[in-house]
């Protein structure tokens, strides 16, 4: 069945660029600002000393808002319960949230939404920005390996990342061996992929390879992974690839070389939970170094249309020693096209 969720289930639309300071915020910063927001809204004790606009209003406006709030309080009213106060608070929250996402101020974002990394919801304001920061990878190629239990939504997660990539890089081209509404160019072999990358080297690209547990099986395709995928992957950054993602089943059957080259490991224990890791040791069935302080809950459905039962074929037919030749990219493309795939 084609998956086509409603627009209401879309992941929050993040900014096109997110500066690196977002990733430098400490758990203590997030905890403090989130708990302050909870105090202000009365979700935990000792909130009476805080105004509703605490941490949101500019210094020039705080005095006037405090006087107005105090006057209303003497009449038994709260500022946010009045029509004027409601409009003011909505405007303050909207303005601060926009500024926080654009500047990468995770402390302000945590304050606004009242979440911490210990209870991070995948639909919260901070998550898209944090994921974008990971996908950026300081300008280096991001290599993703997604695995998990059966029917846990591994493919959905990778297409969500593709949607985020489209919001970060202009004119992103999606290349995949799978059929999906987000795919701009479908390739079904390593030769075709290499030709596509060379032909469109000046355009930012996302590469998605589905059925990775079959195509990158350690028992049957270890040589092909080492002799074809690894050399191509190591040159993808020069060829304009921002993200190279492989969707597997479990970490047990995927070739160790693929795991070793992974910079972002995704594990899906169930449909609504995602675990994000920064390492995947070559000899391990599971990735390591869990990010975000724990699993992400309530992961939303992608807007990308795809059929999970549709085949995603792949052939290992890239000619050996291709990148050892002293050729410019355009000449290398001509060479590939003239020789054709390796039989």
Curated annotation (Swiss-Prot):
UniProt superkingdom: Viruses
Region (Disordered): 1-24
Regions of compositional bias (Polar residues) in chain numbering: 1-11
Chief localization: virion
Any one of the GO CC terms: virion component
Places the protein is found: Virion
Keywords carried by this UniProt record: Virion
Name of the protein: Virion protein 8
């Amino acid at each position: 069945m084609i998956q086509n969720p409603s627009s209401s289930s879309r992941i929050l639309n993040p900014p096109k660029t997110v500066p690196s300071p977002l990733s430098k915020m400490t758990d203590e910063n997030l905890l403090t600002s989130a708990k302050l927001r909870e105090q202000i809204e009365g979700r935990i004790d000792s909130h009476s000393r805080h105004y509703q606009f605490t941490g949101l209003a500019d210094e020039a406006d705080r005095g006037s808002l405090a006087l107005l709030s105090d006057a209303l309080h003497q009449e038994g009213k709260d500022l946010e319960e009045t029509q004027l106060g409601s409009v003011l608070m909505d405007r303050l929250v909207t303005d601060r949230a926009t500024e926080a996402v654009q500047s990468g101020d995770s402390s302000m974002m945590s304050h606004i939404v009242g979440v911490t990394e210990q209870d991070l919801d995948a639909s919260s304001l901070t998550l898209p920005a944090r994921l974008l920061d990971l996908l950026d990878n300081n300008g280096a190629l991001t290599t993703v390996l997604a695995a998990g239990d059966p029917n846990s939504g591994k493919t959905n997660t990778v297409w969500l990342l593709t949607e985020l990539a489209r919001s970060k890089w202009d004119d992103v081209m999606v290349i995949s061996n799978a059929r999906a509404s987000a795919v701009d160019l479908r390739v079904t072999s390593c030769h075709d992929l290499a030709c596509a990358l060379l032909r469109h080297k000046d355009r930012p690209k996302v590469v998605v390879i589905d059925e990775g547990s079959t195509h990158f099986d350690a028992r049957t395709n270890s040589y092909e992974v080492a002799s074809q995928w690894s050399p191509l992957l190591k040159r993808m950054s020069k060829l304009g690839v921002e993200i190279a993602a492989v969707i597997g089943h479990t970490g047990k059957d995927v070739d160790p070389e693929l795991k070793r080259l992974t910079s972002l490991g995704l594990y899906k224990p169930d449909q609504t939970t995602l675990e994000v890791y920064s390492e995947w040791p070559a000899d391990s069935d599971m990735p390591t170094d869990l990010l975000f302080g724990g699993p992400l809950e309530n992961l939303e459905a992608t807007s990308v249309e795809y059929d999970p039962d549709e085949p995603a074929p792949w052939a290992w037919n890239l000619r050996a020693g291709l990148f050892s030749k002293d050729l410019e990219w355009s000449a290398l493309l001509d060479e590939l096209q003239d020789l054709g795939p390796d039989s």
